[in-house]
């Protein structure tokens, strides 16, 4: 059974065949339908739609359940995410192509179908695969270029439903969450107090991806092939994305490579500057790393609450929730000498 909808595999397969046969105007064969690992918030399914010896590699991204808990984890709705991906593509950002946004008559719940792009997304493979050695050497620079493209998308092109999130708003939201979850960690409160007293450099507002990190980029031997998972996108300070990418939690053990575990600050900022014409100082990026560590703490607390309340007792929720102490260690290291 799949998520809370109790949609069986055979029913999912049947509904997909009917939908894809309509999309591709012919009786398709559905090959290799399988759920991909990872993804604490969404279900991700890979498949190939085959018609007349032509194969269409696809990804289905859908809500895992009838109860919409997107507000609790801070996500935009999937229809808006699909719209945003299309807008990003129109502005030169490497993203999958949106094939279809699900509607109730499709019988598949809430979600969308998109093209399955080549490349690897698993962080450990990106960091260790010998075939990606040359790609890793320029990956931080390429990430900087991609982020600058995202941040340059005119705000008037962005869906109006996207939230505008300022630094003060972030601090207030995190305080509410801490209080709601009993505020049992003095480290988290210490870090939040520091962030409240030390606001980052103000920047002109831009589209912020919100989850740009190792694990949400597809990489092959030539470099970045697609940027994934736009569910946390919002309008805010563009340097947030740069700091988030450099968060210790997304280095996967490669602590000496601050950019995603594969690169250095200077390479990231050089790539950003090459497209945007400017780049923040490293210290400004590191300031946002503190926000990243606090955001990770909020994510862990939220997942833990979903699991404990049995609102979603999946192993993915529990696995993230148990990592709460990591954020405390990261925050103490980041704040060392600042408080």
Residue ranges and their predicted role:
Residues 207-209, 214:
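Catalytic-loop of the protein kinase fold
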Residues 205-207, 225:
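Conserved protein kinase catalytic-loop anchor
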Residues 34-192, 197-204:
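ATP-binding pocket architecture of kinase catalytic cores
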Residues 1-27:
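Juxta-kinase regulatory segment immediately upstream of eukaryotic protein kinase catalytic domains
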Residues 228-233:
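Activation of the activation-loop gatekeeper triad in protein kinase-fold domains
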Residues 241-277, 291-310:
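Active-site activation/catalytic loop segments of kinase-like enzymes and analogous catalytic loops
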Residues 162-165, 279-291:
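All-alpha amphipathic helical-bundle segments outside canonical DNA-binding/catalytic cores
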């Amino acid at each position: 059974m799949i998520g809370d909808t109790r949609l069986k595999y055979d029913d999912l397969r049947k509904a997909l065949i009917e939908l894809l046969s309509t999309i591709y105007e012919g009786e398709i064969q559905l090959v290799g339908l399988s759920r991909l690992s990872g993804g604490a918030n969404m279900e991700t399914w890979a498949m190939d739609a085959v018609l007349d010896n032509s194969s269409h590699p696809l990804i289905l991204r859908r809500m895992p359940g009838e109860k919409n808990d997107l507000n609790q984890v801070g996500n935009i709705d999937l229809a808006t995410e699909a719209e945003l991906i299309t807008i990003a593509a129109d502005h030169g950002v490497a993203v999958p192509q949106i094939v279809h946004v699900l509607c109730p008559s499709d019988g598949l719940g809430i979600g969308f179908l998109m093209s399955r792009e080549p490349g690897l997304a698993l962080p450990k493979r990106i960091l260790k695969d010998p075939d990606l050695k040359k790609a890793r050497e320029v990956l931080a620079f390429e990430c900087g270029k991609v982020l600058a493209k995202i941040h340059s998308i005119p705000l008037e092109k962005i869906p109006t439903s996207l939230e505008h999130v300022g630094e003060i708003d972030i601090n207030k939201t995190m305080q509410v969450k801490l209080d709601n979850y009993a505020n049992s960690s003095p480290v988290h409160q210490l870090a939040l107090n520091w962030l409240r007293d030390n606001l980052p450099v103000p920047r002109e507002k831009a589209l912020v991806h919100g989850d740009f990190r190792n694990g949400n980029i597809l990489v092959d031997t030539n470099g970045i092939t697609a940027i994934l998972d736009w569910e946390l996108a919002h309008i805010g300070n563009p340097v947030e994305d740069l700091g988030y990418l450099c968060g210790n939690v997304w280095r996967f053990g490669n602590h000496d490579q601050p950019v995603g575990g594969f690169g250095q600050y200077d390479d990231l900022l050089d790539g950003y500057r090459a497209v945007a014409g400017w780049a923040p100082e490293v210290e400004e990026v590191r300031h946002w790393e503190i926000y990243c560590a606090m955001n990770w703490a909020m994510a862990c607390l939220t997942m833990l609450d979903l699991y404990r309340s049995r609102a979603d007792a999946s192993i993915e929720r529990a696995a993230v929730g148990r990592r709460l102490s990591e954020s405390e260690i990261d925050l103490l290291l980041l704040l060392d000498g600042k408080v």
